[in-house]
Design a protein with these regions (language model features):
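Acceptor/aglycone-binding surface of glycosyltransferases and processive sugar-polymer synthases
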Residues: 65-80, 97-178, 182, 209-226
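Short beta-strand/loop segment that forms part of the nucleotide-sugar
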Residues: 7, 20, 29-39, 63-64
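Hydrophobic helical membrane-anchoring modules
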Residues: 1-3, 173-239
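Short, well-formed alpha-helical segments that are part of the catalytic scaffolds
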Residues: 12-25
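Short aromatic/hydrophobic "clamp" motif used to bind/position activated sugar donors
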Residues: 86
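Donor nucleotide-sugar binding loop of glycosyltransferases
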Residues: 12-15, 39, 70, 96
Length: 239
């Protein structure tokens, strides 16, 4: 099996080289796909420089997203991916690239079909997740678990893995939930549940960010997630 690692990157210039150096080679072939989105710190220039520098040693692609939001960036990356297995890795490196082989082994062995990271099992580094964010994550995990009939500890972890084949099936049915999810979590989780894919969670260690600032707004994005949850409630439980 070949692997595509999709890395959405906005204002993550200081992490680009480390992401290339530390992303493991998995399966018969691994490609790294950076999707840059509306950065103000020359992330796009850094991706091009480091991508060209390391191209002899790694298979690297880079592209700029057309719209806004992580979900749009992920879909852009998927559109140019060639791997049998599609992985998402956040560019902030709060989940370390070295964790990815756990996800590869889970899907390649047939243990699961939709592999989701869980940051809420191991103790976190100090400052890795603010208290209100932690409460929000636990709330949405409970809400999504009830909606889907799945026991999910961390629905909003950015590291997610599924096969290219299943993603294409999911994308073909996307109209059921629509495309208003700017994060991509809702799209993948509910789409995978609708396809009855086997869910597996992989505990990972969540690190504090060492470069830049978070792209997440607690209240704005929390309210949007709440609206998405109620939308799913109507779709899943009452239709």
């Amino acid at each position: 099996m070949s692997v595509s690692v999709i890395i959405p990157a906005r204002n993550e210039k200081g992490n680009i080289e480390a992401l290339i150096q530390r992303t493991p080679r998995m399966g018969k072939h691994t490609e790294i796909i950076f999707v840059e989105g509306n950065s103000t710190d020359d992330t796009w220039g850094e991706i091009q420089r480091q991508g060209a520098h390391y191209q002899e040693y790694y298979h690297i692609k880079w592209v700029q997203q057309d719209g806004k939001g992580k979900g749009d960036a992920v879909r852009k990356g998927y559109s140019i991916a060639t791997g049998d297995i599609l992985m998402i890795l956040d560019a902030d490196m709060t989940v370390e690239p070295e964790e990815l082989p756990k996800f590869f082994n889970a899907i390649a062995s047939g243990k699961g079909e939709y592999i989701n990271g869980s940051r809420l099992v191991y103790p976190m580094e100090k400052q890795a997740m603010r208290f209100l964010n932690l409460l929000g994550n636990k709330f949405f995990s409970l809400a999504f678990s009830w909606l889907l009939g799945q026991n999910l500890k961390d629905t909003l972890c950015g590291t997610k893995v599924l096969s290219r084949e299943n993603y294409l099936r999911l994308a073909a049915n996307r109209a059921y939930f629509g495309e208003f999810d700017p994060f991509g979590d809702f799209d993948l989780i509910f789409g995978s549940a609708k396809l009855n894919l086997k869910f597996v969670e992989i505990p990972i260690r969540y690190r504090a960010r060492t470069y830049g600032e978070t792209n997440i707004s607690r209240f704005k994005h929390g309210w949007l997630l709440l609206r998405m949850t109620f939308f799913a409630l109507k779709k899943v439980k009452f239709t």
